[in-house]
Amino acid sequence: MYKCALVLAAGQGKRIKSDLPKVLHKVCGKEMVNHVIDTIRKAGIQDANIIIGKGAELVKERTEEKKVTYSLQSEQLGTGHAVQCASEFLKGKKGTVAVFAGDTPLIKESTIKNLFNTHIEAKNAATILTAIVDDPTGYGRIIRSGNEVLKIVEHKDCNEEELKVNEMNSAIYCFDIKLLYESLSKLSNNNEQGEYYLTDVIEILKSAGHNIGAVVTDFEETIGVNSRAQLAQAEEILKDRINLKHMENGVTLIDPKTTYIGIDVEIGKDTIIYPNNIFEGNTIIGERCTIYQNSRIKDSIIKDEVDIQSSVILDSSIGNNTTVGPFAYIRPESKIGEKARIGDFVEIKKSIIGDGTKVSHLTYIGDAEVGKECNFGCGTVVVNYDGKKKYKTIIGNHSFIGCNTNLVSPVQVGDNTYIAAGSTITSEVQEGDLAVARAKQRNIKGWVDKKGLKK
């Protein structure tokens, strides 16, 4: 049977108080609307249409990789009106359509599958995803007669008895496409809000003698984000889910409450994560690594048995058995080899560092290719920028760079070379050479007495 989905993403979200469309606010590193789309796809629904409105072009830009189609709701006149705006998407289709809110990032793949299966097996015209809550204030109520679903009543339109109902509408549904399409023209805005409610389709279908079903799920999954407080709540719930998944897969989190792992991050077994670490984007961390406290790693590949202390690594790769930090900064497009050492207060930018090379402290390397088993003394600087353009430095294998050396790019240093401490290198150093580029020391005898500075 054909299955498709509509995602309602047209609202600005006034309560969240932001210039950014509400559905583009991120939870665990991913836009809420993209959480919904990705979960839909995992549940086996490939054909999805996003109803856009406020910030339409930005929403399209942030979702274009998802290969979805779009319908425009130029004026926000309710959820029913939003689905009416997708009429062209629905027209002529047969099968089942699910309707989701773009601000519900916690919905699970298993719940979506269960909703579809229940709907199809029961041959319902509509199936509502619901939850039981202690305080349903603000939510639409599921009105039943026994187990039979009669209708959904929005909170502001509830009478005294309906307000006592604690089964709430999640705003996630399955519909028979043909019956939904036919019902959209029958919607009315004769209500307190003056809006067209999608929930009224339930009563329209029921009045026509069609079956209406419901699937009850955990309230946590149905949380819609309408404020910064709810955004933080969703973040906390999803963070706990992610951390639990990694621990179940063999990763040790010393303090899960202070460990932030983005939803797309991968971590190998027997890796140990200390408190106050942040892993973002498409980061992959290998097996048997140790990440000590206060590190941030984003969009990077960390191979096996790597130790990292209090460092920042962005869009880079770190080879097996390498140590990084404390207080190192690995900037984008850097590649650190195996068994290397990047020490304290070292900055690497857009550079390749060979296997076994040691850059132990207080060094800047930018736009450089460094060979294997080199050693950098404290205070080395690759001078790669002349104020207009950045230049490249190439350093061969087994080179020794003395302390306080300036390598003025563009420059090439051959294999098995030595550079004396305090040198400023401006021209090529050939293989096997020692380069000394500093002023000769001169001692002026009796200078302190002559100047009257002796104490």
Swiss-Prot record:
Its EC number is 2.7.7.23, 2.3.1.157. UDP-N-acetyl-alpha-D-glucosamine binds at residues 8-11, 22, 73, 78-79, 140, 154, 169, 226, 331, 349, 364, 375. GO terms for cellular component: cytoplasm; membrane. Mg(2+) binds at D103, N226. Binds 1 Mg(2+) ion per subunit. CDD domains: GT2_GlmU_N_bac, LbH_GlmU_C. It comes from the Bacteria. Residues 229-249 are annotated as: Linker. The active site is at H361 (proton acceptor). It is an enzyme of class 2 (transferase). One of its GO terms (molecular function) is UDP-N-acetylglucosamine diphosphorylase activity. PROSITE patterns: HEXAPEP_TRANSFERASES (PS00101). It holds the Pfam family Hexapep. GO terms for biological process: cell morphogenesis; cell wall organization; lipid A biosynthetic process; peptidoglycan biosynthetic process; regulation of cell shape; UDP-N-acetylglucosamine biosynthetic process. It is found in: Cytoplasm. Acetyl-CoA binds at N384, Y385, A421, R438. Signal peptide: none annotated. Keywords: Acyltransferase, Cell shape, Cell wall biogenesis/degradation, Cytoplasm, Magnesium, Metal-binding, Multifunctional enzyme, Nucleotidyltransferase, Peptidoglycan synthesis, Repeat, Transferase. Residues 250-455 are annotated as: N-acetyltransferase. InterPro entries: Bifunctional_GlmU, GlmU-like, GlmU_C_LbH, Hexapep, Hexapep_transf_CS, NTP_transferase_dom, Nucleotide-diphossugar_trans, Trimer_LpxA-like_sf. Catalyzes the last two sequential reactions in the de novo biosynthetic pathway for UDP-N-acetylglucosamine (UDP-GlcNAc). The C-terminal domain catalyzes the transfer of acetyl group from acetyl coenzyme A to glucosamine-1-phosphate (GlcN-1-P) to produce N-acetylglucosamine-1-phosphate (GlcNAc-1-P), which is converted into UDP-GlcNAc by the transfer of uridine 5-monophosphate (from uridine 5-triphosphate), a reaction catalyzed by the N-terminal domain. In the N-terminal section; belongs to the N-acetylglucosamine-1-phosphate uridyltransferase family. HAMAP family: GlmU. Homotrimer. This is Bifunctional protein GlmU. It comes from Clostridium botulinum (strain Eklund 17B / Type B). The lineage of its organism: Bacteria, Bacillati, Bacillota, Clostridia, Eubacteriales. The gene is glmU.
